[in-house]
Every structure is written in C-alpha cells, then in structure tokens.
Amino acid sequence: LHSTSRRQRQMCIRDRCEGMAKAVKILCDELGIWCIVALSDANPDKGIKYRHAWNVIRIDGKYYHLDVTFDNTLSRDDAVRYDYVNLADKQIFRDHEPVIWKVPECTDSDHFYYREKKLSWTTVDEVRNRTKQAVKKNRILLFHWRGGYLTKEVLKELLVVFDEEASVKGKQAYVSVNWPQAVICVRFEDGAGEEQVEMEDANEGER
C-alpha cells in the first residue's frame, strides 16, 4: 500500500505540469494565440526526477516561454506570481533542462511580465523608493531585479534597504527570492527584528 501510494504521488507530480501545459495550449487555441507544449527530460544528477512540460507562445511574431506550473508553485493566496510569463531562452534555461524536441528560439524579452508591468528595476534607489511605498501602504513588494546579475553582494544591499525601510514603520521584512529568475517578493509584518530570507525553488514538486 505504501509503495502504491508513493507511485500515485509521483504520477500526480509528473502529470501535473503536462496537464497544465495542455490546458494552456487549449486556452490559447481558443483565444487564437499560437502555442505549443515544450518538454524537457529528467536530470537525476541534479535531483530532477521527472520530465517537465511548459509552453512556448507567439506574440507579435516573437516567441516566448510560459511556465504556469512553476508560477503556481511560487504563488500564495496573497501574491500571485508571474516569474515565468514570456521568458527568453537565456532566462528559462537558468532553471529548466534542455528541451527534448526542438522549439522556436525565444530571443526577445520585451513582453516579460514584470517589464511590461514596470516592475523590473535597475537601481537600488528605485527599489528603496518602491519599498517605502509598499511599507507605507502595507502592501507586498514584488519585483524583478534587472540591474545586472543578482549576486550575493547585490542581495545583501537590497536586504539592508528592506530592513531599514521596514524598521521605520516598526515592521519586519520577510523576503522570498527566486534566484534563477532574479525575482524578489517582500512581505512586511508588524514586529521588530532581522529580516528573514527564503530561497525559493519553483521546481520543488519534481525533485
């Protein structure tokens, strides 16, 4: 019984991404949006046990990766995530394995969700200004860092900003980082103390 239940759980995890990718394909077909399903292989050496499926869509003649399964893994009731909406190859393959079957090259990032929504920032000063607004309005801060590589040094600098601005209002910063995609989510809650940092794994369901 235990082994059967384990196999069922593994099948559920494996089939979830394929089902979601096929659902996106059906929805895009209904909306007249060109869309295909992309599939990557497992990689046991990295602890990735199963194949993974997502979508490639076409917007204004350009191709983009779309992975609703990864975004669903990261999303919570208070913050829906769009980290994997309209990514270029150089972005998606930071945390995706190579595709098994060839798909169109995705070289453009103009329609990346956070860029279109003006939530892709390039300077610490801009992050500080937006952090002040989020703390003042008691809102979640969710953004993409585009000011060069998100290194440990850059993250430390940003954490100082979150902590300083949160402490002004007697709050504490809870930070979640999608490191491969350089997306940062910050929640501000009442209470003093050091900020808490969580490194997210959008592919945790397949490991």
Give the role of each language-model region.
Residues L1-R9, I13:
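Single conserved hydrophobic/aromatic residue that forms the stacking wall/gate
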Residues H2-T4, I48, A134:
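Generic structural signal for beta-strand residues in well-ordered domains
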Residues R6-R7, D67, N178:
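Poly-acidic low-complexity segments
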Residues I13, N55-I57, V186-F188:
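Short beta-strand element of the conserved SAM-dependent methyltransferase core
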